[in-house]
Amino acid sequence: MKLPKEGDFITIQSYKHDGRLHRTWRDTMVLKTTENALIGVNDHTLVTESDGRRWVTREPAIVYFHKKYWFNIIAMIRDNGVSYYCNLASPYLMDAEALKYIDYDLDVKVFADGEKRLLDVDEYEMHKQEMHYSPNLDFILKENVKLLVDWINKEKGPFSKAYVSIWYKRYLELKNR
């Protein structure tokens, strides 16, 4: 499959481990693709939940997906600074329909002041039992939480101020041409 190119719009689909569609984002603008990663932006993007509810994202957000890491990262650009929402999730795959991944409930939120919180641990434990996550999957996800926190602490990749600034600037250039 041909990779989307800068300025293309794609759909993102999040699934649960049992194969159910969880959430869909329409019209994410692609900023960069490589063999293993995709960087995009959501700005007033339509989101549809599995129960049919719809909402629109409030602020611009740089999104980062990778084919080798078990997480994706959303850098939300707000008036009080950049906040991050990080989903523990399968590496993504891309087909003609959408960018797709499996959401594994655990999330790490980083507030603009640097405070970090691990979210949805109870939901993860419940789904781990209900959907029979293997011990190996559980290990991979917990190791990737550690890796993610290390990236946050070291301001690596999407967690660097320069990264957000560069990609947001590029988005504005593409949006305004």
From Swiss-Prot:
**Signal sequence, renumbered to the chain:** none
Pfam families listed in its UniProt record: DUF402 (PF04167)
Catalytic activity from the UniProt record? a ribonucleoside 5'-triphosphate + H2O = a ribonucleoside 5'-diphosphate + phosphate + H(+); a ribonucleoside 5'-diphosphate + H2O = a ribonucleoside 5'-phosphate + phosphate + H(+)
- Reading the lineage from the top rank, the first entry is Bacteria
- Per UniProt, Mg(2+) 2 binds at 105, 107, 120, 123
Q: Where, by residue number, is the active site?
A: 23
Cofactor(s) demanded = Mg(2+)
Q: Name one GO molecular function term.
A: ribonucleoside triphosphate phosphatase activity
Where along the chain is Mg(2+) 1 bound? Answer: 87, 103, 107
Q: Which Gene3D superfamilies match?
A: FomD-like
The alphabetized UniProt keywords are: Hydrolase, Magnesium, Metal-binding
Check the record and name the InterPro entries matching this protein.
DUF402, FomD-like_sf, Ntdp-like, SA1684
Q: Its Enzyme Commission number?
A: 3.6.1.15, 3.6.1.6
Q: Which family does it belong to?
A: Belongs to the Ntdp family.
Function field: Has nucleoside phosphatase activity towards nucleoside triphosphates and nucleoside diphosphates.
List the HAMAP family. Ntdp
Instruction: Name it.
Output: Nucleoside triphosphate/diphosphate phosphatase
What species is given as this protein's source? Streptococcus equi subsp. zooepidemicus (strain MGCS10565)
Source taxonomy lineage? Bacteria, Bacillati, Bacillota, Bacilli, Lactobacillales
